[in-house]
């Protein structure tokens, strides 16, 4: 079940030059549009522009479409000059707005991992599963109207696939660990990598004196610690100076962040193993354990925010990570 959502609010400061409200320019024709997914600077939609042609990397929810259109217009890119809508994976905070945006971009093709293609062509299963958890009204409030993408406009991007944006080569690499339908994209011109959720969560409001952090997301239902370790190492082996995370934006000092991710993935897996046989108490123990990992990271990173604020920022991530550990333990037992 490919579901992910975040429902809390906070205020954050910009990690880059804010050229338009909620749009952050990183150079190399790369920028981030804040989708304002129930809070500022929590979920990014990345734009890649080359010679007046554009690719949109992840879409946010349907509510974010006007923000993307406004950002493109401000950069002088007409809707018919958008060549690609690129999905790192099909969790709804990354792909829920795909159908809406494709309706605005008459010449665009949508790219997606082969395992995710059927879910953008017919999002009924995704939608039904989300409604079953949140209810119809809350699903509509958070995600808006989820539209299908016509099959003839969908390109599957398996391991090693390449596309060109006005001659600028994009390389797609299979990146399981967070989800089996996940890709990361290397931009040949900048040498940078678009990581989706594979390089974790990194919220700018918690940056300490400009020092970034990264915390893994193990949300259900396809967390695979061994695969995630491998995907992180593979991204670093490409030698990027920067990685772009959907949650949120440009990350540097990558070796340090990767070491933190590896350490925390191990800690999550150990937490799961410790409570594997806890029965009805397992969900509560996992949730408490993830909370403890977050608070330990607060001490390690020397975040100035009080414990209550840090737990508020990570509230749904704690819940999702605990759910993902449960799914992982259940799947390992089959």
Show where each model-derived region lies.
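Residue-level marker for buried hydrophobic side chains located in beta-strands
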Residues: 55-57, 86, 110, 192-194, ...
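Active-site metal-binding motif and surrounding structural segment of the metallo-beta-lactamase
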Residues: 66-112
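Active-site/pore-lining binding-face segments in mid-to-C-terminal subdomains
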Residues: 226, 231-290
């Amino acid at each position: 079940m490919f579901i992910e959502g975040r429902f809390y609010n906070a205020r954050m400061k910009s990690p880059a030059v804010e050229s338009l409200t909620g749009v952050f320019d990183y150079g190399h024709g790369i920028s981030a549009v804040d989708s304002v997914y129930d809070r500022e600077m929590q979920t990014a939609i990345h734009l890649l522009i080359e010679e007046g042609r554009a690719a949109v990397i992840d879409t946010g929810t349907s509510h974010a479409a006007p923000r993307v259109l406004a950002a493109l217009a401000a950069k002088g890119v007409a809707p018919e000059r958008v060549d690609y809508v690129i999905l790192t994976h099909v969790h709804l905070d990354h792909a829920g707005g795909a159908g809406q945006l494709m309706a605005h971009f008459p010449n665009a093709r949508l790219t997606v991992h082969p395992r995710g293609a059927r879910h953008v062509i017919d999002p009924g299963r995704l939608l039904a599963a989300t409604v079953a958890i949140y209810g119809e009204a809350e699903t509509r409030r958070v995600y808006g109207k989820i539209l299908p993408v016509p099959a003839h406009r969908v390109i599957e991007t398996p391991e090693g696939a390449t596309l060109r944006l006005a001659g600028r080569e994009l390389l797609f690499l299979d990146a399981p660990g967070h989800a089996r339908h996940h890709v990361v994209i290397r931009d040949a011109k900048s040498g940078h990598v678009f990581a989706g959720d594979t390089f974790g969560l990194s919220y700018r409001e918690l940056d300490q004196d400009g020092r970034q952090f990264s915390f893994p997301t193990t949300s259900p239902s396809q967390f695979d610690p061994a695969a995630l370790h491998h995907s992180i190492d593979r991204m670093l082996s490409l030698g990027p100076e920067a990685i772009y995370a959907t949650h949120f934006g440009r990350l540097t000092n990558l070796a340090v962040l990767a070491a933190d991710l590896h350490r925390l993935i191990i800690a999550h897996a150990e937490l799961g193993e410790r409570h594997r046989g806890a029965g009805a108490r397992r969900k509560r123990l996992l949730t408490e354990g993830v909370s403890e990992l977050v608070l330990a990271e607060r001490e390690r990173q020397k975040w100035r925010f009080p414990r209550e604020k840090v737990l508020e920022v990570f509230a749904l991530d704690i819940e999702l990570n605990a759910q993902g550990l449960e799914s992982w333990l259940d799947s390992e037992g089959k």
